[in-house]
Amino acid sequence: MWVKEMGKATRSIGIQCTRSYLCYEKCKQLPEEEFRFYTGRTQEVFELLHELLGGDEVCANLKYDFKKKTPKRTQFQGDLSPKDKLFMTLLRLRRGITLNDLKIIFQISESRASKICYTWIRFMSLEFKKLEKLMFVSRENQDRRRPKCFKDFKNLRVIIDATEFRIQKPTNQQQSSNSFTDYKSYHTIKFLVGISCFGGLSFITEGFEGSISDRKLIEDSAFMDYLEPHDGVMSDKGFDMEDKCDEREVDLYIPSFLGRRSAFTGRELIYSRAIAVSRIFVEVFIGKIKEFRLVRFLITNSMLPVASDLVRVCAFLVNFQKPFIPIDEEETREL
């Protein structure tokens, strides 16, 4: 897309993009599907995201660099507007564009592209983190229009699952050992993800070393603190959290255990199938996080310090997509 635009770098479309081969003002002229392909969002949602982050009043005052002689941050001067920088960051997240490519596309140095993306990822992560309690939708609010696929779970508040992201082998030997998972045979960081009955993100932890158990993930995160008595939580069998839920008078919906029996009862089969059908939506949500190519394949050591920020930002950005859980049974679900 940007290759075709290179020869038109000075074309006027409301503002001059005299240095950059690519800028937001050019790309917002693209068809909606093309813009979504590169950023994961439509032009309208991009504008809403920019306003949610404070608009130009806040975004124009972000600081990008430290000088060695003073702790005061310095701000870049140049052609890139706040929207250009947000666009650059979304482009890197969604398409996994390298810093060297961003240098060419936006006609800036590689180090500057790195600082812009780093700053915006940290900024968005901190802003989204402020919304965590609001995002954990109450049971009562979900009851107002609970999707019919959850009609058998009247008090269900959150559906949880754990997911891992592959990382480069850490240089620290202890971190390398703790992040290696025998199951996957490579190094990972692990997150607990929870969604509401409407399919939106309710909760996401910081990243933990990949060898952590699901139960330990529950214990070391603040997840249980968000729950109230008589809430319902849905998970798979691996979390081993019955005692934790009992302590807080929380109902736990998990598939039935066979134990030493040879077969499930008919009631248990129906119950387990209902849970399986409902739990698939958290897996769909996690799949949408991994559509962001910067975290999908390999998180390098250079990005490891902000790995939790990367995944959190991608998870929150999924909330800006159209709902994928049908409210009514007749609706078509797009998975």
Language-model-derived ranges and their functions:
Residues 82-85, 95-335:
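Short, well-ordered secondary-structure "scaffold" segments embedded in the functional core
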Residues 1-76, 334:
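Charged, often Cys/His-bearing segments associated with DNA-binding zinc-finger transcription factors
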Residues 90-92:
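Short alpha-helical segment immediately N-terminal to, or the first helix within
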Residues 78-80:
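Short helix-capping and inter-helix turn/linker motifs at the boundaries of alpha-helical repeat units
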